[in-house]
Structure formats: structure tokens, C-alpha cells
UniProtKB/Swiss-Prot annotation:
It catalyses: an N-acyl-L-alpha-aminoacyl-tRNA + H2O = an N-acyl-L-amino acid + a tRNA + H(+). It comes from Frankia casuarinae (strain DSM 45818 / CECT 9043 / HFP020203 / CcI3). TRNA binds at residues 23, 73, 75, 121. One of its GO terms (biological process) is protein quality control for misfolded or incompletely synthesized proteins. This is Peptidyl-tRNA hydrolase. Keywords: Cytoplasm, Hydrolase, RNA-binding, tRNA-binding. Belongs to the PTH family. The keyword RNA-binding applies. Monomer. CDD domains: PTH. The record marks 100 as: Stabilizes the basic form of H active site to accept a proton. The keyword Zinc-finger does not apply.
């Protein structure tokens, strides 16, 4: 059963990544990067919160929103996301998780609601903590590893110098897609961003 947002409750936009400077430029931290960009756009400051996430209360597309970056490692993201959702009384239908996606080419953004975790430990942790997979995802394409490189190593490496030149546009598209999801809903946002690459 598909759940659609109702009323005027807040949105929770949770970007996934690993905390600390060691991981800051990693592909796996694309979700953090998008949330940081949204905070910058709205003049918001992420602050430590008892949910074990850095959070900022703000407005996106005219709606109340909470930006969050879990302070746990990726595979334990579910606890902080569930705690923030509970604290701010956010419906599952208003939860947007922003994460890196291996199976999408670098530079592309894809949106969906629900589905499997596709081997992504952060999504697996969130689905387990929430008891549902029926939340919105903004999937930031990082592409597949070259040759026989282990995907686990690939996601924990920094973007290449070539990718870094194109990264700002990718992050802009991902941040824009979050705002369009909130303003217009899933299908219009998919139609817009799935056509770009």
C-alpha cells in the first residue's frame, strides 16, 4: 500500500554518510553533502541533537523541514533516523533519505518510494529501525567501481579529480530534487530528474 503525505506536518530529510573528517570526501558521504548544501541554501546550521544526529530545523519549498546527518556510522544509521523521526513527529510518508547509489551512473539522480536496500547498509539499518521500507529515497549516482575493485572499497574512496569537477552540479540536482519532492510530489520530481541523464 502506498502512503502519501497528509496534513502539514514537518518533513525529515536525512542524508547518509560516515561521520568525521576521514570520510568527508568519500562517495559514501554523498547524502551528507546534499544535506550540507540544503543547510547552506537555507542559512541553517546543523547542531548536535539527542537523536544522535546533527539536525537543523528549517523550511524547504515553503514547508517545515528538519535536516539530519546521523552521527553513527553508515550501518547504524537507523537508530538516529528513527529517533529524529520520533522526536519531530514525522510521518514515514514525509521522510526523505538521501544516499549514494552504485547502480546509478555518476551524475544522475533517481527518486523512489520503498523497495529493497540493494546492498546499502544504511538503508537496511533504517528499514529495520522503522519497521518499513516505505519512505522516499533520493539516490545520488556514484557509478560502479572500475575493474574488479570491491564495491565496499570503492564507496569509501574519495571522488576522483574529474568527478570532483562535476560533483557540485550533481549535488545541486539532488538538493533541487528534494525540494521538488516536497513541493510537487514524487511523480513530477521523477519526471523532471529522471530525464536529465
Amino acid at each position: 500500500m502506498m502512503i502519501t503525505p497528509t496534513g502539514d506536518g514537518p518533513w525529515l530529510v536525512a542524508g547518509l554518510g560516515n561521520p568525521g573528517p576521514t570520510y568527508a570526501g568519500n562517495r559514501h558521504n554523498a547524502g551528507f553533502m546534499v544535506v550540507d548544501l540544503l543547510a547552506e541554501r537555507t542559512g541553517s546550521r546543523l547542531k548536535s541533537h539527542r537523536s544522535r544526529a546533527d539536525v537543523a530545523e528549517t523550511r524547504l519549498a515553503g514547508a517545515r523541514a528538519v535536516l539530519a546527518r546521523p552521527l553513527s556510522f553508515m550501518n547504524l544509521s537507523g537508530g538516529p533516523v528513527a529517533a529524529a523521526r520520533s522526536f519531530y513527529k514525522v510521518e514515514v510518508s514525509r521522510l526523505i533519505v538521501v544516499h549514494d547509489e552504485l547502480d546509478i551512473p555518476f551524475g544522475a539522480v533517481r527518486l523512489k518510494r520503498g523497495g529493497g536496500d540493494n546492498g546499502h547498509n544504511g538503508l537496511r539499518s533504517i528499514s529495520s529501525a522503522l519497521g518499513t521500507r516505505d519512505y522516499l529515497r533520493v539516490r545520488v549516482g556514484i557509478g560502479r567501481p572500475p575493474g574488479r575493485m570491491d564495491p565496499a572499497d570503492f564507496v569509501l574512496r574519495d571522488f576522483t579529480s574529474t568527478e570532483r569537477r562535476e560533483l557540485p552540479l550533481l549535488l545541486e540536482h539532488a538538493a533541487d530534487s528534494v525540494e521538488m519532492l516536497i513541493a510537487d510530489g514524487l511523480e513530477p520530481a521523477q519526471n523532471r530528474y529522471h530525464a536529465l541523464l
